[in-house]
């Protein structure tokens, strides 16, 4: 299916690795122009190698998104260069395990800022241009917003707020033809996830832990792939989803909604 994303300018945060990279590569395959904001250049060489299998028309910016005031200038520069901005993917963030018992309110607030404020600022800065293009916003959220995890209060709060903002922005911008949706991720295999699994010990212990997790995923008892998240994001950014807004889309193999008895 042609998603008609050829030449569309899409800004993606956290796009060098993991879910963000999966989204960027899918956009590149569809002919879009990804503008990627990433905190570190650590994975840049591999990222460039992979994206250039599909396109050489893309931009990268190195920015710690905690430096909120530096987000709008990137948006302005992008618009000045291309004359249009057609979509935003808010993806960057980290589950930092700031739990209820040991996290001070200052640490809680800092975590919220790192996982939420840049979502707001990027869309805030891009709104005039999204109205011009009748563009689309995709916010990446997490199952922790709905299920909890037990030891990550700040991250869960930020991801819950992202779902609220998705509905709010969809309502605020519907009259301008701008669509806003969220993808809710559960258990997705990424480099960070792989690093976490390694903390459980030797290879046998890692496999055992992974089996406990995948057994709870009803569809095929496997992890979601970054490519599957990328496919959904590309669809939501495209005109093929032209009457879809304000939705929380669960790309999770039924993890959140299906009866645990199925596992």
Where are the language model's segments positioned?
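Alpha-helical segment proximal to the catalytic Tyr-Lys
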Residues: 128, 171-175, 242
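Short C-terminal tail/terminal secondary-structure segment
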Residues: 147, 234, 245-263
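Conserved glycine-rich cofactor-binding loop
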Residues: 9, 16-18
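Residue(s) in the substrate-gating loop at a strand-loop-helix junction
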Residues: 142
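Active-site helix of classical SDR
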Residues: 123, 158, 166
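Substrate-binding pocket helix/loop in short-chain dehydrogenase/reductase
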Residues: 99-100, 104-112, 213
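C-terminal helical subdomain
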Residues: 182, 204-244, 251-253
């Amino acid at each position: 299916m042609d998603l008609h994303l050829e030449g569309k300018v899409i800004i993606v945060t956290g796009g060098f690795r993991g879910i963000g990279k999966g989204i960027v590569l899918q956009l590149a395959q569809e002919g879009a122009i990804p503008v990627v904001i990433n905190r570190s250049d650590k994975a840049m060489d591999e990222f460039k190698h992979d994206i250039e299998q599909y396109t050489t028309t893309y931009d990268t910016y190195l920015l710690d998104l905690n430096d909120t005031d530096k987000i709008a200038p990137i948006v302005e520069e992008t618009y000045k260069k291309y004359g249009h901005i057609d979509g935003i993917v808010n993806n960057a963030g980290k589950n930092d395990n700031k739990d209820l018992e040991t996290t001070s309110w200052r640490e809680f607030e800092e975590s919220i800022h790192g996982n939420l404020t840049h979502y707001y600022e990027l869309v805030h800065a891009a709104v005039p241009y999204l109205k011009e293009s009748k563009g689309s916003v995709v916010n990446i959220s997490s199952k922790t917003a709905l299920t909890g995890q037990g030891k990550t209060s700040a991250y869960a709060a930020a991801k819950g707020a992202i779902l609220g903002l998705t509905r709010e922005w969809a309502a605020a911008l519907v009259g301008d033809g701008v669509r806003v949706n969220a993808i809710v991720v559960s258990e997705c295999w990424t480099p960070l996830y792989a690093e976490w699994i390694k903390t459980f010990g030797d290879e046998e212990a890692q496999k055992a832990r992974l089996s406990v997790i995948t057994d709870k995923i009803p569809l095929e008892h496997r992890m979601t792939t970054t490519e599957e998240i990328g496919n959904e994001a590309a669809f939501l950014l495209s005109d093929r989803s032209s009457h879809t807004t304000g939705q929380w889309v669960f790309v999770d193999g039924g993890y959140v909604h299906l009866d645990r008895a199925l596992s």
